[in-house]
Every structure is written in structure tokens, then in C-alpha cells.
């Protein structure tokens, strides 16, 4: 159907009590409405002037009766169209047969057009927005290309580095090319990568000439590389990415915070020697494991040991601005205290290991109240948490989040879970992962 300037479509159903053909229906429509209204609404004149369109008839003959569906397009206004529709219902004969006509619907074709326009405009706009390049994306793309161009190569090993490594008085040693790119995004250009756990000779020589900061991932791989650097290079400061994160996956704010919190090697080992001790000798005399442990964020603390005169204050590493003078002890005394503490820790952890083993792979929690062990699902535990004032111990076969710590920090001194994923830990609370308990 060619709608043209059509505003409305009149849908009509006709039933004739005998056999009729299509031309009989068309003839009845024009013949029985002729002269019924004024000349302005005569169907023949309206069709000649184009104010109504071509009348379509869909006819079926079934069991001696004829059924027709008639559509009549109209570009008249709504009043004239309504009059015209009502006129069609006055038809009572088609050829020799009696007939009844009923208007089923008058459709405003402009509503359909508006709906089509709305849907099509939405589709076009969505396509435009998908194809449009955001200004921020353009800026970042240009910056990224410049940063990539800024990456240079250092030494015979062609190690990726920032443009200022050669001329800067200080350098930052990282693990790989992606870490160099990440620090370039933060505006740090004096970075060089070791590209693996085997430290190249050019890095060893460079660290002897410049103030060097080792900045490694906060995972097991980062620990291994840090140990290698401490053994082979002249490291002045040590910084670690947040626990469980890689340098390349760390935000600019976190990177700057980690670098500001870097720990001098002298401070790490200063608690195990007097002021006249040579730093390089101390580094060589202390295992890399001890140094790595001292700069790794304390995501758990060991259980309390019997009260003894402290060899040194554990908070020296944690707080850069507060340095407590160590109490001078002989080497023999230090070894004795450590041995005593280790035996006490083993005794206290033996019961904890049994509890951890009992809930592994169950999804349950176990807690100790007044010396009595209780096991629940986590949902049941949360339902009854208001009834529990104090617990001696809490373990859960699930990761420990910050929400769990905030809920339980004033109810128990020890929390054990599959993993520890917290950003803030109260001073009086100890957090352990399953791996740390079993190890």
C-alpha cells in the first residue's frame, strides 16, 4: 500500500450472505455512499483529488458466504475520516446479497511514523556514540604512544628503562617492561627493569654508582626477585607493591604511596648491629629472607610469646618516623630468645592447625567461646552474632574481607581464613591465612 500523504487508515470487515466478487464489493462501496453526504465527501471526488487512496479488498468465499477485509487510506482530518468510516457501515447489500459492514479500527498512521522515527533515531544515535572517539581516549592514546617512545634500552642486555636512568642520581629497579611503562605513566622516568630473576651485570654495576630503590611486586615472585637483588646488587631502599598486587596493576596513587614508604636498608638491618657496623657486611651476614620479611607488609602477626625483655622494637620497620634504640644483647642471648619464642609459637599453633584442618573445604566457620568449640555455617553465625560477646578464636573457610574484620575486631583477638584481603587492621587483632598456619 502506497501511503503517500495518508493520515489515517480505515479497516473494515464485510460479510455477505452469498457468493460475491471483489468488483461487487467495490461497486457497493461507491454506489451506496453516492449522494449520501455532501459533494465534499463523495468518494469518487475524494479519490480523484487524492484525498483518499486506493480501496483494497481481500475477499474469501466460504460455504456460500463471502468475507471481505477492506482498507481505505484517508488524508482527511479526523472528523471527516470518522464521518467517512461511519458512512461505510450503512452498506447493506452487495450485488444480490444482503451484507453487513463493521469498522474494526481507524489507525492514525502518524503514530506509527513517530514510533518508527523514535526507534530509528535511537539506533542512529547509538551507532554515532559507538563510533565517536572520546577526547579522553584520544589524549590517553597520544600519551601512551609518547611513553612507549620514551622507553629506552640500557646495557648490552638491552634492558627496558626510562629516559633518565643514565643521567639521574637515583634509579628504581623493577621487574619487567610493563612496570617501566606503569611508572612512566606516573611521571617516573628513572626506572630500569631486570627482566627476570637473574640480575644482569649491567644492573649490578649501575647500583654501585647510583642511589637505588628496589620496587617489586607484592607476591611470591616479587619476593624472589627482591632476594636476588639484595644478594647481588648495592640496594639503598626497598619498596613493595600492595600485598597480592603487581606493580603494573597498581594505581598511580598506590605507587606513589609505596615509593614514599620505601625502607632504607640501613634501617632494616640496623637493629641487628651497632652504629659502627658496616652496612654491606650486615647485608651479607643477614639472609635475604630476613630482609624481605622486614619490608613485606605485616598481613599477619604471630601469637603472643611470654613476656621477655625485647631485643628490639618491631615497630621500627612499620613506622618510618619512629626509631626505637635497640637493647644491646649478645648474639647468644638473641638466639636463645628466638628459640624459646619459636617453641612457644609451635605449641600454640598446634591447636589452631587442627581447627583449620577440620573446616577446610566445608565452607563453615569455627569459633571458640569460653573454651568451647562451635561450628556453624557463615549464615548461621551472622544470625547469632549479636548473642556472642567475646570469642577466644575465629576461623572461616572463606576469604577474610574488611567487612568481616570490622564486624569481629572487638569480639576476638585472632581471625583465620582462606585468604586475608583487608586494607586496615586494628592493632589488637591478629590475622592469619590457612597457608600461614599450615606452613
Curated annotation (Swiss-Prot):
GO terms for molecular function: DNA-directed RNA polymerase activity; metal ion binding; poly(A) binding. One of its GO terms (biological process) is DNA replication, synthesis of primer. Mg(2+) 2 binds at residues 217, 219. It catalyses: ssDNA + n NTP = ssDNA/pppN(pN)n-1 hybrid + (n-1) diphosphate. Binds two Mg(2+) per subunit. Its EC number is 2.7.7.101. Keywords: DNA replication, DNA-directed RNA polymerase, Magnesium, Metal-binding, Nucleotidyltransferase, Primosome, Transcription, Transferase. Gene3D superfamilies: 3.40.1360.10. It holds the Pfam family Toprim_4. Its cofactor is Mg(2+). It comes from the Archaea. Mg(2+) 1 binds at residues 175, 217. Residues 169-243 form the Toprim domain. InterPro entries: DnaG_primase, Primase_DnaG_arc, TOPRIM_DnaG/twinkle, TOPRIM_dom. SMART domains: TOPRIM (SM00493). One of its GO terms (cellular component) is primosome complex. RNA polymerase that catalyzes the synthesis of short RNA molecules used as primers for DNA polymerase during DNA replication. Belongs to the archaeal DnaG primase family. Forms a ternary complex with MCM helicase and DNA. This is DNA primase DnaG. It comes from Methanococcus maripaludis (strain C7 / ATCC BAA-1331). The gene is dnaG.
Amino acid at each position: 500500500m502506497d501511503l503517500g500523504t495518508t493520515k489515517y487508515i480505515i479497516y473494515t470487515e464485510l460479510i455477505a450472505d452469498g457468493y460475491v466478487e471483489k468488483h461487487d464489493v467495490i461497486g457497493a462501496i461507491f454506489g451506496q455512499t453516492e449522494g449520501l453526504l455532501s459533494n465534499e465527501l463523495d468518494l469518487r471526488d475524494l479519490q480523484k483529488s487524492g484525498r483518499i487512496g486506493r480501496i483494497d479488498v481481500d475477499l474469501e468465499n466460504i460455504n456460500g458466504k463471502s468475507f471481505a477485509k477492506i482498507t481505505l487510506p484517508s488524508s482527511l482530518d479526523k472528523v471527516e475520516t470518522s464521518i467517512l468510516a461511519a458512512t461505510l457501515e450503512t452498506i447493506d447489500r452487495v450485488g444480490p446479497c444482503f451484507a453487513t459492514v463493521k469498522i474494526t479500527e481507524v489507525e492514525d498512521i502518524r503514530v506509527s511514523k513517530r514510533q518508527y522515527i523514535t526507534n530509528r533515531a535511537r539506533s542512529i544515535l547509538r551507532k554515532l556514540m559507538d563510533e565517536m572517539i572520546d577526547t579522553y581516549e584520544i589524549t590517553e592514546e597520544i600519551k601512551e604512544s609518547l611513553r612507549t617512545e620514551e622507553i629506552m634500552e640500557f646495557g648490552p642486555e638491552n634492558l627496558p628503562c626510562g629516559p633518565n636512568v643514565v643521567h639521574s642520581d637515583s634509579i628504581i629497579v623493577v621487574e619487567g617492561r610493563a612496570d617501566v611503562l606503569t611508572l612512566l605513566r606516573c611521571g617516573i622516568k628513572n626506572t630500569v627493569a631486570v627482566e627476570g630473576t637473574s640480575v644482569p651485570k649491567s644492573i649490578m654495576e649501575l647500583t654501585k654508582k647510583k642511589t637505588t630503590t628496589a620496587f617489586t611486586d607484592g607476591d611470591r615472585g616479587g619476593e624472589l626477585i627482591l632476594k636476588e637483588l639484595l644478594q647481588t646488587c648495592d640496594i639503598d631502599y626497598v619498596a613493595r607493591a600492595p600485598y597480592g598486587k603487581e606493580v603494573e596493576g597498581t594505581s598511580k596513587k598506590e605507587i606513589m604511596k609505596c615509593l614514599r614508604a620505601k625502607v632504607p636498608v640501613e634501617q632494616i638491618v640496623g637493629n641487628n648491629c651497632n652504629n659502627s657496623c658496616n652496612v654491606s657486611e650486615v647485608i651479607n651476614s643477614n639472609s635475604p629472607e630476613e630482609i624481605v620479611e622486614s619490608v613485606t607488609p605485616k598481613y599477619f602477626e604471630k601469637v603472643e610469646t611470654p613476656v621477655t625483655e625485647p631485643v628490639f622494637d618491631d615497630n621500627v620497620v612499620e613506622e618510618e618516623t619512629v626509631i626505637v634504640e635497640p637493647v644491646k644483647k649478645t648474639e647468644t642471648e638473641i638466639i636463645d630468645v628466638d628459640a624459646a619464642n619459636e617453641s612457644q609459637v609451635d605449641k600454640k599453633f598446634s591447636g589452631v592447625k587442627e581447627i583449620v584442618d577440620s573446616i577446610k573445604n566445608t565452607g563453615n566457620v569455627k569459633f571458640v567461646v569460653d573454651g568451647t568449640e562451635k561450628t556453624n555455617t557463615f549464615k548461621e553465625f551472622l544470625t547469632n552474632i549479636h548473642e556472642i560477646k567475646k570469642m577466644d578464636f575465629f576461623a572461616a573457610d572463606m576469604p577474610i574481607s574488611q567487612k568481616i574484620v570490622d564486624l569481629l575486631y572487638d569480639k576476638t583477638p585472632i581471625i583465620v581464613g582462606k585468604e586475608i584481603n583487608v586494607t586496615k587492621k586494628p592493632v589488637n587483632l591478629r590475622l592469619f591465612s590457612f597457608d600461614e598456619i599450615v606452613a
